[in-house]
Amino acid sequence: MSTEKVAFRMFLIPGCAAEYQRRHAAIWPELSALLRAAGVSDYSIYLDQEHHVLFATLRRSRAHGMDALPAHPVMRRWWAHMADIMRYGTDGTPIVEPLPCMFHMD
């Protein structure tokens, strides 16, 4: 199955890095299953500690189902669980900014 790589950034509230990492170390099995079912794999999140910016990369199948994730109850519950430690928009979802690929080497 063909995949594409996606990169984006999110924003952590200063002082919340340890809690962010703790919550992700205990990621809910139903959330992992939901992401996999949506075609997501090889998902990593990195922290720019100086600027409190989270940088994420993932692979997704070309026929991914990520567009349906924001409406899913498990995703909504996870976002509510993370709302106190990340910057969110007025719609109750984390601020996510796509990042264009500027260079790639196999």
Swiss-Prot record:
Read off the InterPro entries from this record.
Answer: Dimeric_a/b-barrel, L-rhamnose_mutarotase, Rham/fucose_mutarotase
Q: Which UniProt keywords apply?
A: Carbohydrate metabolism, Cytoplasm, Isomerase, Rhamnose metabolism
Subunit comment for this entry?
Homodimer.
What family does this belong to? Belongs to the rhamnose mutarotase family.
Keyword Transmembrane helix in annotation: no
Name of the protein this chain belongs to = L-rhamnose mutarotase
- Per its record, what are the GO molecular function terms? L-rhamnose mutarotase activity
Q: Which GO terms describe its cellular component?
A: cytoplasm
The reaction(s) annotated as catalysed by this protein in its Swiss-Prot or TrEMBL entry are: alpha-L-rhamnose = beta-L-rhamnose
Q: Which domain of life is it from?
A: Bacteria
GO BP annotation list: rhamnose catabolic process
Lineage, please?
Bacteria, Pseudomonadati, Pseudomonadota, Betaproteobacteria, Burkholderiales
Active-site residues are: 24 (proton donor)
EC assignment: 5.1.3.32
Q: Which residues bind substrate?
A: 20, 43, 78-79
Pathways per UniProt: Carbohydrate metabolism; L-rhamnose metabolism
General function of this protein: Involved in the anomeric conversion of L-rhamnose.
In which broad location class does this protein mainly occur, judging by the first location in its UniProt entry?
Answer: cytoplasm
Q: Where in the cell is it found?
A: Cytoplasm
Write down the species: Verminephrobacter eiseniae (strain EF01-2)
Q: Identify the HAMAP family for this entry.
A: L_rham_rotase
